[in-house]
């Protein structure tokens, strides 16, 4: 049986069925053609990114498949989707096993009207360009300061590197992070009692720490992408710039393997 889940809730758990499968297109490259005065032919500007993908799923609910009445079903689905407007949430389906993406529901008002009258609806979504593998969403951790990863996908990945200091020093000190023998940051990165845990987020393009759930920007140091499968491996090396014990560092890399 074909189904999908949105923000962790499966359509089938509500007695729903897909009546028309989504047509999943591959994200297109964000490219512009610009006319230059006096020049024959347009210039092509590659914005180095991909566009969102719009898709729809037609669903129906069968009352004999559940103990709920038709009105209860409509109410349950509306209660499920109503809080999920205006932001991205995790979307999975049975056409892409082992992968997830981030999608936004774009037509809640239409869905609300259709469900209350027909117990059918067409859900329209806008998703981010990539599908992310479940395995790539798992952090790989080391306490010896060294990790080597090889990307299994055909597209470069944007990793999140988390560095945690578990020692007893109460003042910040510095460490160096090397990726494929290239140093990130000339003066090292501060860590210690004041900033015991921090993130270098390749996807969000941010280097930050968390304080009361809020991101606090630390620097412009970012991890490079993990090359695609045909390229070389990705070696991360963490080294304290002082006599602090290297075993007091924990480094983890969430690789975020992805495909279009």
Predicted regions and their residues:
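Solvent-exposed edge beta-strands and adjacent loop segments
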Residues: 1-54, 97-110
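Oligomerization/assembly interface segments of phage tail-like spikes and tubes
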Residues: 34, 42-69, 117-130
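Solvent-exposed loop and beta-edge segments used for protein-protein assembly and interaction
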Residues: 49-53, 83, 115-119, 153-157, ...
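Hydrophobic residues positioned within well-ordered beta-strands of beta-sheet architectures
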Residues: 55-57, 101, 121-123, 159, ...
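Beta-strand elements of well-folded, non-transmembrane domains
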Residues: 59-63, 107-109, 127-131, 165-167, ...
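Short N-terminal edge-element motif at the start of the domain
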Residues: 66-103
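Short beta-strand and beta-hairpin "edge-sheet" elements
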Residues: 88-132
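Intrinsically disordered, low-complexity segments enriched in serine, threonine, and glycine
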Residues: 133-260
